[in-house]
């Protein structure tokens, strides 16, 4: 009888310990962009690493129609992590465009905690139009597909056009039809972009089969105006597009994407997350080339990402701790570190 009671007590104790251990695991439903997107693919790779190395957390990847849906989802309590870009943070802070009127619905403030890669946007025209469309301002009055309405790439290019005073006519088209519409004259231009200055989107590759498009670079004066307006500018090699783009360089405007969590994840845990990512970045890059930029210089990339958004959203204290340790922190950002 005593042995039976002892066995039951031991079994109960084990069950209680198991239940206690289970309760210590914090669920992180992490919003990202749609299945098949670079953001969805990258988060799957990242979540696998973090779930293995940080067992107190359980990350589940939650695809959404677009990255801004994940930002809004975090702010309203639907997600604990999100896929956020500097252009989205700009719109949120300024109560404009896709975030117009959204602040009234917010339950918590998004913060920046990890920057992962850039996306670089620009413009393309048909090669036959190179003689008459020579810079971005020449697109005024023209029919332009700058991307699907909710997408960050569209928002960034539209913002750049606005800074230059480009009064184009936006055309919403199916991605699969963009090339044929450009070829047939249904549109005069469409957006082109790269990811981490290394690859392009499948739909742009498909459009290349239907239309002989040429990269349309902003003029030197336009580049100067864009820089003055706060845009970063980069030159990408044409061979990224794996076709003749009829220019010897492609001038694009990068913006920064990150996988972010809020203050619900403590400073020390975000710091550990960042150090784990840095330690395992070679394996991450092998699984997804989108991590190549942080493989080259993770601390420097965090500095650039923070600089892109420091005026729009606060900085997670765990990211600040990591950056201070790596010597890439700017003391003028001290007041922008998030506090509960």
Regions found by a protein language model. Give the residues of each.
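An extracytoplasmic/periplasmic, membrane-proximal ligand-sensing/linker region
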Residues: 177, 194-215, 225-227, 268-340
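Extracytoplasmic small-molecule ligand-binding "clamshell" domains
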Residues: 42-76, 245-247, 340
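Pocket-lining segment of extracytoplasmic ligand-binding domains
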Residues: 86-87, 95-105, 112, 127-129, ...
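Ligand-binding clefts/hinges and TM-proximal coupling segments of bilobed small-molecule sensing domains
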Residues: 134-135, 141-159, 230-299
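Bacterial N-terminal signal peptides that target proteins for export
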Residues: 1-9
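Bilobed "Venus flytrap"/periplasmic-binding protein-like clamshell domains
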Residues: 25-53, 57-60, 121-184, 195, ...
